Amino acid sequence: WFGMDDFAPKVRHAYMNAVSKLYRDCFCRKIGDWCRAHGVMYIGHIIEDMNSHARLGCSAGHYFRSLDGQDMSGMDIVLHQVMPGMESIIHTSSCAGNNSDGEFYNYILAKLASSMAHLKPEMKGRAMCEVFGAYGWAESATFMKWLIDFLLVRGVNNFVPHAFSPIYPNPDCPPHFGAEGHDPQFEGFKTLMRYTNK
């Protein structure tokens, strides 16, 4: 973008408005209509890492429009984005930029998902989070319970654990639950899932 005095913000706003509406109408709603016509729920999330939910290129430019057409709102918590006691500081993370904006992940992201789930009647109050990914093998069942509770009190009520991998070892964003018997915390994970399903 080149500076054009007071005109540049107006152009940027009009561009983002037009592109994010086209994304909603020509992508999300089309996929959602196809899924429902074939008896499949359309769920997922966009890239929210490092506040990219409001940017084009790395994400869709508008959180609410980008999920319009889905049967649940969606988000993910990965890469040490949420850590106890780190909510008010930017801390190191293994995501793009090598740091994590604790305020966004602790106070905003889950509320975006739960708000959308309540604003869109067709979502029936369902807010989904892909959770536990890329915290590494040191992520304990105790921390996972803390993370589930953290999300529940913010209105997230459906969870997709990351990840169950058919191969071990798999370098993609551990932990991997089960891990062909190599995950010593798998018994704790089963207990956690029973807790979460209540």
Task: Name each region found by the language model.
Residues 1-198:
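Carbohydrate-binding surfaces of carbohydrate-active enzymes
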